[in-house]
Structure formats: structure tokens, C-alpha cells
């Protein structure tokens, strides 16, 4: 649905939005993005359609294969056993396009960090949540807060889900 589109926070204006920052070539990042995808599907199944999510690959990982992150037909990884993911997976660039006007000084072109990862001071596996007005609410690192239901008996997953619902209801 979003293939080839330039998407980001302004694309989801008026809705709670989550951004997962990962490395498309690492199995742990792929597994976490799969859980974020499952959470999104669960929310939609429960009638919650105004919480949007997407993933963003770091510029430094631009040459990694995307196949198993989005679970297309070329992927044979066990992280894709439930089929293709529906969440958009975007690529951060290091071209400085986002480093002007209000963002001047927050990032630089060609510094090998990527514009969005640089501006938002991203750490691998961060999940950044914005409210309906595009304001920063919180950041949860999914390395340390593993949302897998096999970890912490699903408590972290449920905590993240309830947080999204509470932000949505504000």
C-alpha cells in the first residue's frame, strides 16, 4: 500500500503513531518488528484503527536485505512463518533533506548516521510513540523491554498495548 511513498510522522497526522527503528538484516530486529506487526493486527481486530505503526531501517544498514524484514516470498526465515507483514518498512537516508528549517542543526547530510535516526537520537530497536498531534510521548527500547509473549509471560507486550490505548484515549 505504501511502497514507493515518502511516509513519516506527518503521514499519520491526527493518529497515535509508533516508529520501530531496526536493522533489516538482523534476526532479533526482524523478530521484534514481527511482534510490532502482530500488535498492530491485534489492535485493528479489536476495532482500534487510529493507532498507526511503521518501521524504519537505519541508513548504516541500507545494504542489508529487506526480504525477511517484510517477509516477502524470498524469505525462508522462521521469523516469517505467519506470512508477509502489513506494516510499512521505510529507509532512512543521509541526504540532509530533513535537516533544514526547524530541524537545522539537528542532523547533517552525509554524516553516515541517517537523518531521522540522528534527529531523534535513535538507538537500535527503539519504539518511539507520538500522540495525535505528532508530539513525542515516550521511547521504549525493545532490546531491554522484549515484547515477545515468551518473555516476561507477555507482560511487556501487554504494557505496550495498554500504553498505546491510553495515549489514544487522551
Stretches with model-predicted labels:
Residues 1-17, 42:
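A short beta-strand-turn-helix
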Residues 9, 30-40, 157-164:
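Extracytoplasmic/secreted envelope proteins and their assembly/folding machinery
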Residues 13-18, 46-53, 83-87, 123-125, ...:
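Loop/turn elements at helix/coil->beta-strand transitions in domains of secreted/extracellular proteins
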Residues 16, 20-26, 58:
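Aromatic-flanked redox-active Cys/Sec active sites in thiol-based oxidoreductases
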Residues 27-30, 61-65, 97-101, 106-117, ...:
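Extracytoplasmic/secreted cell-surface and envelope-processing proteins
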Residues 28-83, 95-99:
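Structural microenvironment flanking redox-active thiols in thiol-disulfide oxidoreductases
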Residues 70-124:
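Short, internal strand/loop/helix patches
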Residues 122-170:
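Thiol-/selenol-based redox modules, centered on thioredoxin-like
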Amino acid at each position: 500500500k505504501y511502497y514507493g511513498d515518502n511516509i513519516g510522522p506527518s503521514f499519520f497526522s491526527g493518529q497515535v503513531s509508533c516508529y520501530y527503528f531496526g536493522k533489516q538484516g538482523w534476526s532479533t530486529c526482524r523478530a521484534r518488528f514481527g511482534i510490532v506487526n502482530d500488535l498492530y493486527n491485534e489492535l485493528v481486530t479489536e476495532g482500534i484503527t487510529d493507532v498507526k505503526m511503521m518501521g524504519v531501517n537505519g541508513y548504516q544498514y541500507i545494504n542489508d536485505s529487506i526480504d525477511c524484514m517484510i517477509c516477502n516470498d524470498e524469505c525462508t526465515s522462521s521469523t516469517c512463518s505467519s506470512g508477509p507483514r502489513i506494516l510499512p518498512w521505510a529507509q532512512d537516508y543521509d541526504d540532509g533533506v530533513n535537516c533544514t528549517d526547524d530541524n537545522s542543526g539537528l542532523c547533517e547530510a552525509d554524516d553516515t548516521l541517517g537523518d531521522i535516526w540522528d534527529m531523534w537520537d535513535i538507538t537500535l530497536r527503539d519504539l518511539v510513540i507520538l500522540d495525535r498531534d505528532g508530539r513525542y510521548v515516550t521511547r521504549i527500547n525493545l532490546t531491554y523491554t522484549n515484547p515477545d509473549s515468551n518473555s516476561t509471560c507477555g507482560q511487556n507486550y501487554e504494557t505496550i498495548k495498554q500504553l498505546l490505548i491510553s495515549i489514544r484515549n487522551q
